[in-house]
Amino acid sequence: MKYYLIAGEASGDLHASHLISSLIKEDPQASFRFFGGDNMLQAAGSKGAMVRHYRDLAYMGFIPVLLHLPTILRGMKQCKADIMQWQPDCVIFVDYAGFNLNVAKYLRQQINNGKLNTKLYYYIAPKIWAWKEYRIKNFKRDIDEMFSILPFEKAFFENKHHYPILYVGNPTADEVREFLRPSRCSGEQASILLLPGSRRQEIKDNLPAMIEASAPFVNDYSITIAGAPGIEPEYYAPFIHNQEGIKIEFGKTYDLLSNATAALVTSGTATLETACFNVPQVVCYKTPFPALIRWAFNHIIKCKYISLVNLIADKEVVQELFADRFSVEAIRNELRNILPGGNARQQMLDDYQTVHKRLGNECAPDNAARIIVSLLSSSQKH
């Protein structure tokens, strides 16, 4: 069968590449065309063709999007025309809601007009539970099946909006399970791991406070910064200059997590990775205009928590020190609470079991691929 995939950023390219590999296992005759990146190209091999690289269209923020709007619109037009010409059995949208929902709306119109016979699937639901909830009408109107990688999204879509979706498993949990599968021995040395984010601004905002908060523990714990891929070591140098006992490691995040006693983590996927390794953590995220951000979070942003761990558990498993709660003293106090002997450590480890249970043991891309091939095979018989 013919599969057309659209991924508009690096994370989408990675997730889509795993899905392509799984689809090939389920459907050895599969062929692919896609808007995506190098990972998808490698996964598809001779079975695939990249129409356009995501870096040509990956603009974030109002001003960059506005400045590059002609390029983005040309990309949409090219994508629509290519799909109409190739006539795939299905189109699989991967996150990247702004671009993908525009294309999906057009394709649904062509399907309704009898000019296209294809199924429209969405792999990795956009986070409309936090922002732009009105987009639910687009999914109901245009998408045949939604595949989610976050278990709490099922209640949001189905209970609140009466829109059935499929939770297929979580890729982060998959990766941690795969990493832990070989017999690994945890190190004996007690350690505190600092995960200050993957973007320069995040690192600049969060790392100094993380270092200052953890410094009093340097005699009892080794303190290590997990360097982000794509950020050169020189960028970190000013932060650790004259800091006794603090080191930085690159390309070893999972090794470091598998041996960590506790962690300070900037919000994002890293919070879920840390929980999957059963490492107690404090979530730290410095923001501009703290009071304003807190007000917006309480009144505009439609979710109770910022960390995936708490969202999945639907309770405060880990402390979230962001906006007006972010301070060196607060981080230090919460870190002390989750170190051995601290009053919050065991409860957090117990609560992690709820997170593991809700994530399940399904391999997300394999599960999604099985369902997609089954749905397509079934639809072609009728």
Stretch-by-stretch model annotation:
Residues 1-382:
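Nucleotide-activated sugar donor-binding and catalytic core shared by glycosyltransferases
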